[in-house]
């Protein structure tokens, strides 16, 4: 809270009677005071040593599992390396529960790991193409895409929200603020604000493509929600606040374990940084090789819900090849050599922040035909012309052409780095030989 907010809260608390607008502002400031304190404590937890975070994750996982409202009825929502690590981590501490995933959305190397670990495959409610054609491209961030989608679908009920997105001025629910974070950043307001009449009047543009945050709902969230309804199980999730976006504030305010009337979930890794997660992934990789025979792939699912398992498959590593190897950079921080984060091959959230080769460039390297489809063959405009991510990326100023040039540049840089490391090692060995000779 700002000093001005604190002073205003004191002024409102000193009043005997508050009018409607003052009361809304008072309620907002009280809530903000509590939430800000939670966020500060969460940030302190993020700065703790790895051992402390790991120990807390163990306690959080068991606390959720044993809660009377959960009573062991849990599952692990598995996707990329973060949640693969979570699944193995839970198993390593004695929490043996099912893992489920909409695996068809993931990279082939991730699907391979899912299969070997016995992860149950769920089906998306719509295909990736159907979601983009019906709702729009998932671009910039989930939060911003959701606001753009709201502007594109004006109703009387969302008029106040649309006004806040355009101007930053909120109503009663937002505490009658001005300049709030509800407003789209100026860069995106200029490009997308014209979807709303108020934005058009202010001179903002309307995008030539639809934008939406609905992809995750139809492809991942709804299938998992249906699994919960069928089984009564609640999820463990591998989310980390350090990844930013909506989850950062939600995890800080609601906590690692969240239990309410309609929502229950556990995120034991919420305070982890990327380095923490990769360190644990290496530990779980070692643990897996001692216990790999405990994991069997699902080879058949029967109509009654039971499954048939096959023989164990011994993975070379639990780290899917899309990530490359895990290495320590010059600052001593663990990194993955290739993909940093993964998801649907057509997802564009955060693409504007990536240097080339970006995720679409790397997709071209893995599968040129899939790249060609997502770039040029998803939708048709009113003139019958086909387009895809090419049009969306052009509009937001993200370069995508000639991915092979950037892939080659990256591989050359890696070769030079490996040669340099070899030379350094050879020099060190030579110096040791000289020392021994003396």
Regions found by a protein language model. Give the residues of each.
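ATP/NTP-dependent adenylation/nucleotidyl-transfer catalytic domains that generate, transfer
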Residues: 37-41, 66, 72, 262, ...
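Intrinsic disorder/low-complexity segments
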Residues: 15, 25, 436-438
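Low-complexity, intrinsically disordered short peptide segments enriched in small/polar/basic residues
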Residues: 3, 14, 36, 55, ...
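Short amphipathic alpha-helical heptad-repeat segments
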Residues: 2-13, 18-23
């Amino acid at each position: 809270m700002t000093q001005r907010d604190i002073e205003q809260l004191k002024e409102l608390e000193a009043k005997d009677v508050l009018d409607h607008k003052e009361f809304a502002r008072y309620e907002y400031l009280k809530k903000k005071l509590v939430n800000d304190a939670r966020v500060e404590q969460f940030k302190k937890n993020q700065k703790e040593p790895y051992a402390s975070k790991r120990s807390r994750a163990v306690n959080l996982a068991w606390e959720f599992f044993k809660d009377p409202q959960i009573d062991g009825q849990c599952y692990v929502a598995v996707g990329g390396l973060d949640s693969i690590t979570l699944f193995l981590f839970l198993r390593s501490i004695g929490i043996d529960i099912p893992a489920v995933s909409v695996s068809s959305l993931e990279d082939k190397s991730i699907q391979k790991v899912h299969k070997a670990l016995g992860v149950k495959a769920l089906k998306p409610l719509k295909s990736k193409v159907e979601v983009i054609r019906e709702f729009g491209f998932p671009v910039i961030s989930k939060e911003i895409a959701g606001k753009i989608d709201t502007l594109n679908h004006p109703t009387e009920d969302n008029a106040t929200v649309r006004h806040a997105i355009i101007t930053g001025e909120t109503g009663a629910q937002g505490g009658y603020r001005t300049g709030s974070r509800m407003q789209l950043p100026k860069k995106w307001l200029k490009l997308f604000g014209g979807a709303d009449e108020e934005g058009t009047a202010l001179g903002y543009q309307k995008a030539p493509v639809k934008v939406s945050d609905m992809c995750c709902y139809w492809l991942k969230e709804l299938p998992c929600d249906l699994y919960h309804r069928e089984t009564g199980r609640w999820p463990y999730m591998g989310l980390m606040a350090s990844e930013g976006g909506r989850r950062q504030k939600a995890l800080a305010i609601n906590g690692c374990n969240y239990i309410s009337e309609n929502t229950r979930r556990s995120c034991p890794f919420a305070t982890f940084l990327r380095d923490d997660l990769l360190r644990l992934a290496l530990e779980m990789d070692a643990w897996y090789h001692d216990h790999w025979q405990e994991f069997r792939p699902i080879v058949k699912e029967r109509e009654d819900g039971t499954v048939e398992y096959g023989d164990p498959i011994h993975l070379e590593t639990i780290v899917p090849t899309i990530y490359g190897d895990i290495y320590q950079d010059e600052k001593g921080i663990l990194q993955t050599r290739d993909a940093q984060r993964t998801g649907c091959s057509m997802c564009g959230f955060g693409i504007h922040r990536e240097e080339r080769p970006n995720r679409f460039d790397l997709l071209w390297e893995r599968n040129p035909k899939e790249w060609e489809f997502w770039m040029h063959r998803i939708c048709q405009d009113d003139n019958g012309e086909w387009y895809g991510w090419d049009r969306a990326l052009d509009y937001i100023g993200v370069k995508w052409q000639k991915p092979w040039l950037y892939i080659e540049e990256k591989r050359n840089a890696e070769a030079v780095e490996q040669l340099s490391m070899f030379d350094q090692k050879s020099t060190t060995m030579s110096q040791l030989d000289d020392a021994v000779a003396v």
